[in-house]
Amino acid sequence: MLTVEDILAILPHRPPFLLVDRILEIEDGLRAVGLKNVTMNEPFFVGHFPGRPVMPGVLIVEALAQVGAVIILRQPEYVGKIVMFAGIDDFRFKRPVTPGDTLKLEVSLDKMRRRIGKGQAKATVDGTVVAEGGLMFAIVD
């Protein structure tokens, strides 16, 4: 398990754009499961949407990408690098994520070639899939 302090030591992201609170499971270079506690205090709820707060889908994808970045950046050859989004494939959003939800963020890294990685990602709330699809990562200095 990785705490938020551990995550801050790995990722360059900082609040309010750090979207992972904890890593529950990790298999270095292969997969990880993260957690995001979604609270009413999230800055994006101010305008998305007044009176009916919904977490933007792109931020769910970003949270999943941050879990993927943790998988990559724990590998010795990539320590200190930055992982950027290179693409998303066939992403689907199944239901809204609202304040009080706990997002479980599951990412598997299927392929890593040079500085490009591909993987699969799934976000769930209480065991129900809320979003899933493919992610592509690029590693930069």
Curated annotation (Swiss-Prot):
Compartments reported by the entry: Cytoplasm
Coiled-coil region(s): none
Catalytic reactions on record: a (3R)-hydroxyacyl-[ACP] = a (2E)-enoyl-[ACP] + H2O
Gene3D superfamilies: Hotdog Thioesterase
Enzyme Commission code: 4.2.1.59
First-listed, main subcellular location of the protein, grouped into a coarse class: cytoplasm
Active site: H48
Gene Ontology CC: one annotated term: cytoplasm
InterPro entries noted in UniProt: FabA_FabZ, FabZ, HotDog_dom_sf
GO molecular function: (3R)-hydroxyacyl-[acyl-carrier-protein] dehydratase activity
Pfam families: FabA
Keywords, comma-separated and alphabetical: Cytoplasm, Lipid A biosynthesis, Lipid biosynthesis, Lipid metabolism, Lyase
GO biological process, one term: fatty acid biosynthetic process
The family this protein is said to belong to: Belongs to the thioester dehydratase family. FabZ subfamily.
Protein purpose: Involved in unsaturated fatty acids biosynthesis. Catalyzes the dehydration of short chain beta-hydroxyacyl-ACPs and long chain saturated and unsaturated beta-hydroxyacyl-ACPs.
PANTHER family for the chain: 3-HYDROXYACYL-[ACYL-CARRIER-PROTEIN] DEHYDRATASE
Protein name: 3-hydroxyacyl-[acyl-carrier-protein] dehydratase FabZ
Protein's organism: Herpetosiphon aurantiacus (strain ATCC 23779 / DSM 785 / 114-95)
Gene this protein is translated from: fabZ
